[in-house]
Amino acid sequence: MRPSDYPPAFDPAEVIAAPSDTDPIEVGVLIVGGGPAGLACAIRLGQLLDSAPAVRERLGDVPVAVIDKASRPGAHLLSGAVVDPVSLKKLFGDRKRIADMPFQGFVSHESVYYMTKKKALRIPAPPTMRNHGNYVASLAQLGRWLAEQAEEAGATILPETSGEKLLVTDGRVRGVRTGDRGRGKDGEPLPKFEPGSDLIGQVTVLAEGTQGHLSGAAISRFGLEGENPQVWALGVKEVWKVAKPLDHVIHTMGWPLRGAAKYREFGGSFIYPMGDEMLTIGMVVGLDYRDVELSVHDLLQELKTHPKITRLLGDGERVGWGAKTIPEGGWYALPKQMHAPGLVLTGDAAGTVNVPALKGIHYAVESGMLAAEAIFAALQPGEVVWRPGALAPYDEAVRSGLIGKDLYRVRNMRQVFEKGFVRGAAMAGAATASLGHVPHGRVGGERDADQELISTDRSKNYPAPDGKLTFDKLSSVYLSGNKTRDDAPNHIRIETRVPREMAELWVRMCPAQVYEIGPADAGKVQVVVTPSNCVQCGAITAKGGRLTPPEGGAGPEYTLT
């Protein structure tokens, strides 16, 4: 049995529409997503337009608009995060210093451990995981700060605005239709109903982040699929207030994950200092795992019972929690083109993540800058920004620059772990030493949803929640500040009558307790969905369902993640 055997009632074509003639809102450059890629694009465009009044005038009254589905900038952003500052330095130049940026601290040293249930063996940090000179950050806080810089650069930011449909006519992207707000559970308009609008831009930048709704539709509509299918990991993260500050970055591998190839459990944990009073701890696991009883949230709770981790947390207090997927396909899963007429794909929406280095934020910033520069060049007199090929220089800059060079060097690193931890670690070492030439050629892959499922008794090892060190899913969702209305329409598409094994996969997988097993009938069970619990992590899209945009302003209210 595979998750892909039970696809949801969803067709990417339903996300594509023609613009309406009814009161469209025209902007110059329309950016979808207020994360590091979209905001870097807005900032760089503002810098370029400052010295080009004719181009600014050509873009109209709203030269740059950023829409974001979160209630405010940063509220849906989550990452580890240790940030390489190279792209932020390039973006701001002399305008901002590192000291001006909301970093939690400088990484001066780090440790990597191979874990067993009771022991932690310190091992040399792989070259790809060395972080000296980088900075620890809360991506939610960094996103808020970047939004302030974007507004100072002249961008208009529209929070609580989801992108529902991609507007396409005559083979080019014209903009985005935003989602309605204020509908009831059955789709009926409520007293405060607000219909969506058509936002028309000369060019549209998709910077939605992981599992982008419009990005996936655009890739399908324009045939941009990469050589390998994209695959994802799920990260679950907690922020703790602790009495004794942590003074270095920690990564772990091994326990509580199992190394045998039959389980396909790829991942590890991170523990980062966040100033004098807090630290962040998280677990990341590839969603190509096979065991229906695996739960990343519960693996994180299990990890915290390790003696080494328990000592770090001490008598601390959990003050933050969140979950998000991460694109892990690498070089061969990048779209074969990151542009189409009137469109560019940036950041996690395009899959620009370096898995062995555990890095994606500076690549998102870099791609946003490169997109801005390509758009600006295509807006010059005599150019037509939406003509076929006008934005091709963006692709060339991504693939030949920092992003492409880094991702190509680690092009098969994620895929070699499909043979298990020991063999994968050996192959990863060879790949690092050979700058990616070993293994030779392209190592293929399968979609996460195409993995054959197995069932074990894995869940018996998960610790019971005690409310002090270990926690259940519902209390964690509460800590995320989730604002989704109980009477909002269901934004999750799944097949609701499936074999029990399939239902158990979704129940365990979801970190927010969205799915429950209902009555059984004729060899199948009913899956009960509670969409108001959803923190929009995107895991269901990787494992057989489909996450669509809820109404703008719904979802988590991340502040420390």
Model-derived segments and spans:
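Active-site-proximal substrate-binding core of FAD-dependent oxidoreductases
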Residues: L59-D61, A75, G351-A357, M369, ...
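N-terminal FAD cofactor-binding segment of flavoenzymes
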Residues: R44-L48, G60-K117
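C-terminal auxiliary extensions adjacent to catalytic cores
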Residues: F417-K468
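Iron-sulfur cluster-binding cysteine motifs and their immediate structural context
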Residues: A503-L560
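Predominantly flavin-linked oxidoreductase catalytic cores and closely associated redox partners
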Residues: E57-G60, A140-W145, Q149-L312, L370, ...
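Glycine-rich Rossmann-fold phosphate-binding loop(s) that bind the pyrophosphate
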Residues: G33-P36, L139
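FAD-binding beta-loop-beta segment adjacent to the flavin cofactor pocket
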Residues: S4-D5, K324-G351, V355, S475-D487, ...
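Extreme N-terminal leader/targeting segments of oxidoreductases
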Residues: M1-V29, R44-A65, S476, G481-K483, ...
